[in-house]
């Protein structure tokens, strides 16, 4: 433009530094050429503009990285806890369903094929949820008396298979484990019209793996018969549709009852009969596939399965 050279040639009045009046100090020129202004800004003046960075605002700004980690860790903990609670509830439901399915099966001897299949499915589901993967490392749970509730091994009950239940029935089958002495006692209690007796086998066990034990039977024990020393004598009985009055012979029956009580006390004081078991076929193994404080599932030789419930457990109550 034509005006720019004019401004650059505009005369500026300044004081001569060599003037005789040395008391006056030099002053800055009133006007500066435009090119001088430009040179000053290039050399001495710099303008700093703030840098603005745009980023997404998230939870890090408020709580920091540690806070975020704590939030996610807390959420993860809650999720794991919820799943654990659901798993426990599902296991308890399966246990109750199994106990209900076993009711009335006479430990597996009187069970339909459909019910047996249902029981097998419940057992498999529980085994998949076993809360004690290494039961032989939790011997405190194995300790105590276990009541047999079901088995697929029918040969365990030869007396019942011969159909003599009206005279003698199996009242209870149990297994008592003592991990301190590494002993197992299998016991069958029989109940008759006027007495109860038991047959037991004592064995030692060795731990072979976290789930498997080897059992060696050493001794058999026939318990002392316990006679029923209290017989309720009814006033009458009905035989083939005819009512018979027992009052005339009640005195005689009372005398028999007193004699039975005396015999019962005498027999009960006798020690049980113990005998050694032959060495043949006196060993077996047992694999525990489910274990908690109430329920135990084991598998033995030939794939037989045993369901046992801890004495005193609510699962024994239908």
From Swiss-Prot:
Interacts (via N-terminus) with ABI2. Expressed in flower buds. Detected in tapetal cells, endothecium and connective in anthers and in subepidermal cells in filaments. It is found in: Plastid, Chloroplast, Plastoglobule; Plastid, Chloroplast thylakoid. Induction: Up-regulated by abscisic acid. This is Probable plastid-lipid-associated protein 1, chloroplastic. The modification Phosphothreonine is found at residue 57. Simultaneous down-regulation of PAP1, PAP2 and PAP3 leads to impaired long-term acclimation to environmental constraint, namely photooxidative stress imposed by high light combined with cold. The keyword Phosphoprotein applies. PANTHER family: PLASTID-LIPID-ASSOCIATED PROTEIN 4, CHLOROPLASTIC-RELATED. Belongs to the PAP/fibrillin family. The keyword Transferase does not apply. GO terms for cellular component: chloroplast; chloroplast stroma; chloroplast thylakoid; chloroplast thylakoid membrane; cytosol; nucleus; plastid; plastoglobule. Probably involved in light/cold stress-related jasmonate (JA) biosynthesis. Contributes to the protection of photosystem II (PSII) against light stress. InterPro entries: PAP, PAP/fibrillin_dom. GO terms for biological process: photoinhibition; response to abscisic acid; response to cold. Residues 1-55 form a transit peptide. Keywords: Chloroplast, Phosphoprotein, Plastid, Thylakoid, Transit peptide.
């Amino acid at each position: 433009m034509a005006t720019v050279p004019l401004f650059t040639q505009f005369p500026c009045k300044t004081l001569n530094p060599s003037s005789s009046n040395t008391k006056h100090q030099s002053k800055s020129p009133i006007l500066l050429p435009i090119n001088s202004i430009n040179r000053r800004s290039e050399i001495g003046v710099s303008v700093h503009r703030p840098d603005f960075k745009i980023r997404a605002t998230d939870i890090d700004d408020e709580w920091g990285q540690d806070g975020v980690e704590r939030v996610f860790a807390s959420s993860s903990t809650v999720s794991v806890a919820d799943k654990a609670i659901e798993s426990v509830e599902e296991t308890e439901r399966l246990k109750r369903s199994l106990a209900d399915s076993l009711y009335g099966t006479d430990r597996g001897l009187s069970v339909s094929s459909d019910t047996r299949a249902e029981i097998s499915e419940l057992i498999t589901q529980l085994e998949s949820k076993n809360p004690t993967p290494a039961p032989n490392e939790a011997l405190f749970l194995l300790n105590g008396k276990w009541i047999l509730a079901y088995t697929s091994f029918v040969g365990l009950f030869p007396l019942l298979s011969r159909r003599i239940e009206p005279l003698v029935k199996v009242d209870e089958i149990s297994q008592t484990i003592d991990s301190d002495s590494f002993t197992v006692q299998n016991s069958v209690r029989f109940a008759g019209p006027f007495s109860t007796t038991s047959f037991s086998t004592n064995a030692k066990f060795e731990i072979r793996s976290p789930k498997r034990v080897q059992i060696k039977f050493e001794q058999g024990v026939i318990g002392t018969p316990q006679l029923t020393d209290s017989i309720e004598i009814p006033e009458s009985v009905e035989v083939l549709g005819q009512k018979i009055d027992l009052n005339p012979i009640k005195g005689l029956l009372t005398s028999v009852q007193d004699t039975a009580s005396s015999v019962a006390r005498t027999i009960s004081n006798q020690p049980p009969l113990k005998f050694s078991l032959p060495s043949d076929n006196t060993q077996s193994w047992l694999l525990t596939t489910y274990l908690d404080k109430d329920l135990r599932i084991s598998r033995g030789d030939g794939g037989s399965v045993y369901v046992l419930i801890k004495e005193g457990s609510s699962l024994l109550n239908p």
